[in-house]
């Protein structure tokens, strides 16, 4: 009989076998900081217009080529619990503002890196946290003073276009003027009088071929589908939408039939035909000339639809059906009954068109007062179009933010350097040990212009010293000139490089909260993972014998 081996005394004694336990500065805090630094370093090189792309292949073997931090993090599936906190902060930024996710990561990474220096010098964690929280509060007090201008008229396409340049530029440098104009046209055309803008009302349809500059905006909806029948174009369309198949009702009983004569064979399907004819005629008599269905279309129903000159469109996606109902003002009917006038939708024209070599059905409103607008994107590869779609998404979200708060702050690192300068001065006036943390908080802001400079290929230290010198003279709006080949600065307000006030406000708040949360952790206790061994993923033939 084997002897009972006692567990080592201490915390591990209380836990189940296989559980892991880390505590103290070395094991918990520094480890967490290291993980967050690594994550921030990964996305830092993707920051700004000259940021590098990342090639990510997810667990479904889908390829992503992008410099959008939100997409990179979503597909990376980060496992480390501390790094996950930073990822969650960037997801919150994505939900709140729709842009600035990389700012949160880079800034939180810089805060933790500088906190590690202070902890190694002998400051306690609570002093660092207190200093960071005071500095964050001070940054939010200073930020309103840095506002350089406000959006005046959100119904002017040219003004809106100029305000969207910066957010689009970070994803599609070189195409920002063209894309910002498209996004502005789409947003302004459906901006309601109430001022409540819904980002879901801007749809994107990606069609392979041609180039980015062949993209266009359309008031209405575009579907990559073909029409089912012979009718391919209808003006002044009255639309009936059905969520059921466009077919006759079939009973669930067995259909065994005994036919004794040729006449009976002739009359066999006549009743079914007459019923289908009556159903389609009843729909046509209501004035409906376009039928959209969410199910299959029977051959017989198609024949009668052609007979009564009804255009038939089949949409497999229930989401597409819902959006179409919203666009044309229709109600989706669950059964093949003739619609009443209130249930029918209206559209100026519905037609089949060919874009490149792709057939599309277009539901078009001539007036710019539709509920939904569609941006038709063209591009040479699917990955490129996906990246352009992300740029469009950022632009639309920026417009949404401007409808909530019209204030703008200078971009290109100008706001960050001014905050760093003023918070450093404030830190000098604080008597306690938290002054060191406040100064480090200010220093963390330098990570943003430093990342922009490094990604543009110029010397970061030279740029930052130039920016400090200019800001010391009182030029608050001067930031990094990313187009210059040598370290240079210029006025961001004149250059039109502007960031939203809300975007900056939330990014600073969320990054600080995430960094403080990571620093507050002094113990990590991990239970043994449940279940047996997981099968190896990726190998399709993992259970077959290997012939080496």
UniProtKB/Swiss-Prot annotation:
Binding of ADP, residues: 47-48, 100-103, 169-171, 412, 499
Cross-link (Glycyl lysine isopeptide (Lys-Gly) (interchain with G-Cter in SUMO2)), chain numbering: 224, 254, 260, 534, 539
GO biological process: protein folding
Residues that hold ATP according to the record: 100-102, 170-171, 412, 499, 504
Coiled-coil ranges from the UniProt annotation: none
UniProt family annotation: Belongs to the TCP-1 chaperonin family.
Oligomeric form and interacting partners: Component of the chaperonin-containing T-complex (TRiC), a hexadecamer composed of two identical back-to-back stacked rings enclosing a protein folding chamber. Each ring is made up of eight different subunits: TCP1/CCT1, CCT2, CCT3, CCT4, CCT5, CCT6A/CCT6, CCT7, CCT8. Interacts with PACRG. Interacts with DNAAF4. Interacts with synaptic plasticity regulator PANTS.
Protein name, as recorded: T-complex protein 1 subunit theta
Organism annotation: Bos taurus (Bovine)
